[in-house]
């Protein structure tokens, strides 16, 4: 007996099973798409590990799941605000040192270092990336609390509202001219904060409380400008360097947001699941972190009467007791990074140790044999010189005895 809930199979007149080829083709296409997604995810994960050699971010510091074969990013990472430049750059030829170059420019704009100080740049970049990952972890846990698996505008609001000064700066940055008649927005988070401004009176009061927050902002800006006027007067007067002040990780040129660099910055952060164009907010927070680090380093040196530009030790000592620069989160800056993909062990052979003699052996055997050939050639030249110029005076061996007994022997 066949149960009633089981559908009978379709067969033809000869009893052969009828198979719907359209369903098979659709399943094959879905399988191919899934394979492509997993392949792209593996490539992104390898690039994340490649960038982590500079950023110091490990998979143990990330709270959103990564080891599941595909990314959690569902919404488009970029939108109308970005310049479509994916075809201009090639991923396999794009150097990861670009992150350090941008960090060096931002540190230079903060007045805290020269453009060519690699150690300071690496220190600032690693501290900035670790702070951003901690912010993403905070927002991801908020999203999970609200039964969501993607960070959206509400989570950003909960993070930035922890600090009224930063929330004031955020509103002034992304809502420069609030207009109730505005209807077009490039992304959802601008639309959300635009409505919040007109619906929440507290938000409007915070937005217009310039007298309270401007002195704090101007204090940092004045100190950085003084540093530039003392050590970089040509940069301040040259209009060719105006784009430096607008440079960021997703805007390396200083003129427009780059979609290609936004994806690379997202991969370096560990691919957090973000709502569309929220990468702009993380990029803005990165600039704030670097500016805050630079200002605190300058203040630390001013308090001790140090002159000149800060060195690496000044950065390390100034940040020794500092925590989260923006939102007072509990961030551990001492955790050592771990690698996601272990590189194969490379065995390298070295020549055996040779004791030092009268003739110092070089580090490589090729140089040693060349030196021996030169010495032998020099000996042959000396012998031929003696034979040609002193043929009638052969050399005579003279024995010298120190005791008479040796002579008899």
From Swiss-Prot:
Keywords assigned = Developmental protein, Differentiation, Sexual differentiation, Spermatogenesis
Q: Assembly state and interactors?
A: Component of a complex containing fem-1, fem-2 and fem-3. Interacts with fem-1 and fem-2 (via N-terminus). Part of a E3 ubiquitin-protein ligase complex, at least composed of cul-2, elc-1, tra-1, fem-1, fem-2 and fem-3; mediates the ubiquitination and subsequent proteasomal degradation of tra-1. Interacts with sel-10. Interacts with tra-2.
Listed GO molecular functions?
A: protein phosphatase binding
GO CC term, one of those recorded = cytoplasm
User: Which Cys-Cys disulphide bridges does the record give?
Assistant: none
Q: Would the keyword Heme be found if you checked this record's keyword annotation?
A: no
Purpose of the protein: Required for male development. In XO (male) animals, fem-3 directs male differentiation in all tissues. In XX (hermaphrodite animals), it specifies the first 80 or so germ cells to be sperm. Negatively regulates male development when bound to tra-2.
Task: State the superkingdom.
Answer: Eukaryota
Gene symbol here is: fem-3
Q: What is this protein called?
A: Sex-determination protein fem-3
Gene Ontology terms describing biological process: cell differentiation; male somatic sex determination; masculinization of hermaphroditic germ-line; positive regulation of gene expression; positive regulation of meiotic cell cycle process involved in oocyte maturation; positive regulation of oocyte development; protein localization to chromatin; regulation of germ cell proliferation
């Amino acid at each position: 007996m066949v149960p009633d809930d089981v559908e009978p199979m379709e067969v033809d007149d000869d009893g052969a099973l009828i198979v719907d080829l359209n369903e098979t083709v659709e399943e094959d296409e879905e399988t191919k798409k899934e394979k492509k997604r997993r392949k792209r995810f593996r490539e992104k994960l390898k690039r994340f590990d490649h960038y982590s050699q500079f950023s110091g971010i490990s998979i143990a510091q990330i709270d959103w799941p990564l080891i599941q074969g595909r990314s959690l990013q569902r919404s488009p990472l970029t939108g109308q605000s970005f310049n479509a430049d994916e075809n201009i750059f090639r991923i396999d030829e794009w150097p990861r040192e670009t992150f350090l170059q941008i960090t060096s420019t931002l540190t230079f704009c903060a007045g805290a270092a020269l453009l060519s100080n690699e150690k300071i740049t690496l220190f600032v970049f690693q501290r900035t990336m670790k702070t951003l990952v901690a912010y993403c972890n905070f927002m991801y846990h908020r999203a999970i609390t609200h039964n969501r698996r993607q960070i959206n505008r509400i989570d950003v609001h909960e993070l930035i509202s922890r600090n009224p000064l930063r929330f004031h700066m955020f509103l002034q940055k992304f809502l420069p001219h609030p207009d109730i008649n505005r209807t077009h927005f490039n992304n959802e988070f601008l639309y959300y904060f635009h409505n919040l401004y007109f619906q929440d009176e507290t938000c409007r009061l915070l937005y217009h409380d310039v007298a309270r927050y401007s002195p704090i902002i101007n204090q940092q800006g004045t100190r950085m400008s003084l540093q530039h006027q003392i050590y970089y007067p040509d940069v301040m007067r040259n209009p060719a360097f105006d784009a430096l002040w607008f440079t960021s990780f997703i805007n390396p040129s200083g003129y427009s947001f780059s979609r290609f660099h936004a994806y690379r910055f997202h991969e370096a952060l560990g691919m957090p699941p973000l709502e569309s164009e929220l990468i702009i907010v993380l990029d803005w927070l990165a600039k704030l972190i670097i500016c805050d680090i630079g200002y605190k380093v300058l203040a630390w040196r001013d308090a001790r009467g140090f002159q000149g530009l800060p060195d690496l030790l000044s950065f390390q000592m100034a940040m020794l007791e500092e925590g989260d620069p923006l939102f007072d989160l509990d961030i551990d800056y001492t955790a050592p990074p771990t690698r996601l993909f272990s590189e194969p062990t490379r065995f390298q052979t070295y020549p055996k140790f040779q004791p030092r003699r009268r003739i110092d052996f070089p580090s490589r055997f090729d140089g040693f044999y060349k030196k021996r050939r030169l010495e032998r050639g020099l000996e042959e030249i000396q012998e031929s010189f003696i034979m040609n110029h002193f043929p009638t005076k052969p050399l005579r061996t003279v024995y010298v005895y120190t005791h008479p007994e040796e002579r008899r022997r």
